[in-house]
Design a protein with these regions (language model features):
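Active-site metal-coordination segments of metallo-dependent hydrolases
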Residues: 214-226, 286, 345-351
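Active-site recognition of the HExxH zinc-binding catalytic motif
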Residues: 79, 178-184, 189-209, 226-233
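Acidic/His metal-coordination segments adjacent to aromatic residues that form catalytic metal sites
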Residues: 172-187, 210-214, 272-278, 334-343
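Long, amphipathic alpha-helical stalk/connector segments used for oligomerization, subunit docking
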Residues: 238-342
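Contiguous, non-catalytic segments that form substrate-binding/exosite surfaces or channel walls
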Residues: 37-189
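N-terminal helix-rich structural modules
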Residues: 1-65
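C-terminal substrate/ligand-recognition segments
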Residues: 343-363
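Inter-helical turn/loop segments and adjacent helix faces that build the functional surface
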Residues: 50-58, 96, 119-130, 208-215, ...
Length: 365
């Protein structure tokens, strides 16, 4: 069938091509090593959560070391004439996107962004006192459910719960699951997390139902998927027009905290640019730098030029170089993201790609 795919319709031909590659790649990975790796990543998540919550990188280090070792082996097992080294991992998440393409993309961003970030964030006003008040989690949950519904998430075909790190998952267009996390001293975090994840979810729910249970389902690519979440989060969610419609509801939910805060003050706050330690809470201007940091680190981990034991120190060094501030803890530094606990090396660059696509979509509208 693979040899005759040119005679098939586009959807079936694509399905056959993807299936053929996955089967071929799977056969290249030793079964025993893959089974051990599956057990390792299953255990690594709970260890990662504990390490993050206790600021204890040493607890997670042996697990991450083994995960990186396996990913390095993957780049050897799965190498072909089109991809080798880190390119093998990049291709898993955004097919045909290589280091060469990402390097051109990030080099252009780095040249223009780093000096702008330094200049803009040097003048930023301090966080207003109202933004650090106590916003009870149950009330945040109520408002985030309101936003989820406003943005047309179909509750008959999905659900929203809580997790340590917000994410979207599911099993086709009729079973889409999103999670959120609530910090009682940071109302913006949960708001923009739920808008972001609802962007993923509504894209997923609107995919062609005929592609359910196929390898073509779930969206065109991770970069395109991320463009939808970033479009919702930044283009829609940070606009004054959006909050003209919904700020009154937020004030009703938190009258004590927000009654004296004007719409313009709130919109200015959620659009402020500052050097933040946490990627998921970064503004549009500084967000790409967070991704570039991870992109550079992943390459060094995979090519062996950076040892896992040296990761926290290297993270802080590069973070200081890009942002001019140093993470005070590993929880706010190298331990902030769950991706590496799952072995998702090569995933982070799709976030920056998605942001660029979202901006291009908006510019074309």
């Amino acid at each position: 069938l693979y040899e005759h795919r040119a005679e098939l319709d586009d959807v079936l031909a694509h399905e056959i091509e993807v299936m053929h590659k996955r089967i071929a790649d799977t056969k290249k990975i030793p079964a025993k090593e893959y089974a051990e790796y599956s057990r390792l990543t299953a255990e690594a998540y709970s260890v990662y959560v504990k390490a993050k919550n206790t600021n204890d990188f040493a607890l997670f280090e042996p697990y991450l070391t083994k995960i990186v070792d396996f990913c390095r082996k993957q780049t050897v097992w799965l190498a072909d004439e089109h991809a080798h080294g880190y390119d093998v991992l990049l291709d898993m998440y955004e097919p045909h996107y290589t280091r060469e393409k990402y390097d051109r993309f990030f080099d252009a961003l780095r040249t223009r962004l780093v000096p702008v970030v330094r200049r803009v964030t040097a003048k930023i006003a301090p966080v207003p006192a109202w933004a650090t008040q106590n916003f009870p989690a149950d009330k945040q949950r109520d408002f985030c459910e309101y936003l989820r519904d406003v943005m047309c998430f179909d509750k008959t075909r999905g659900i929203m719960k809580e997790s340590e790190h917000p994410f979207t998952s599911g099993f086709g267009t009729d079973d889409v699951r999103i999670t959120n996390h609530y910090y009682e001293d940071n109302i913006a975090s949960s708001i923009f997390s739920v808008i972001h994840e609802t962007g993923h979810a509504t894209y997923e729910q609107q995919c062609d139902r005929s592609l359910n249970c196929t390898l073509s389902g779930g969206g065109a690519s991770l970069g395109m998927h991320e463009s939808q979440s970033r479009f919702y989060e930044n283009v829609i969610g940070r606009s004054k027009a959006f909050w003209q419609a919904h700020y009154g509801k937020l004030q009703q939910t938190f009258p004590q905290q927000l009654d004296d805060v004007t719409l313009d003050e709130f919109v200015a706050y959620v659009n402020r640019s500052e050097r933040s330690f946490v990627r998921t809470e970064a503004d549009e201007l500084t967000y790409p730098l967070h991704i570039m940091l991870r992109y550079e680190i992943e390459q060094k981990l995979i090519d062996g030029s950076l040892a896992v034991k040296d990761l926290p120190a290297y993270w802080n060094e590069k973070f200081t170089e890009y942002f001019g501030i140093t993470p005070p803890t590993d929880t706010l530094g190298v331990l902030q993201d769950v991706h590496w606990a799952y072995g998702n090396f090569g995933y982070f660059p799709t976030y920056a790609l998605g942001s660029a696509i979202a901006s291009q979509l908006f510019a074309a509208m």
